[in-house]
């Protein structure tokens, strides 16, 4: 089985991408320098499923980008759950904020702009942490949040 075969199989067996996420994907590809960094439909569905299965009350996402994965994870949150997402690039803030508001999940998504290494320590404990920021910073992100920020 090739990767293309696997992707076709997955696409055939998951719910189609909804209009909001399709629009976010399109806008990201039209207006952002590195659109390939978008999590996308398959990854988004996987993240939403994991959140539904684990039922975390608090999620930390490092690396908002344009907000696709944050919306997917927020959709899976239990009642009263919240997602904190950190993005270092303030130029992406407007796109993410607009789609967070349109998603109807704006009251569950808390966006923070700045360095995750600086901001995460003040955000408290989390049940789930999704690291998807600057790949060179992964070891530092992991050290910053893995032992002191997981419940």
Predicted feature locations:
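SAM cofactor-binding core of SAM-dependent methyltransferases
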Residues: 40-117
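Conserved small/polar residues in nucleotide/adenosyl-binding loops
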Residues: 148-151
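N-terminal auxiliary segments of SAM/dcSAM-dependent transferases
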Residues: 1-17
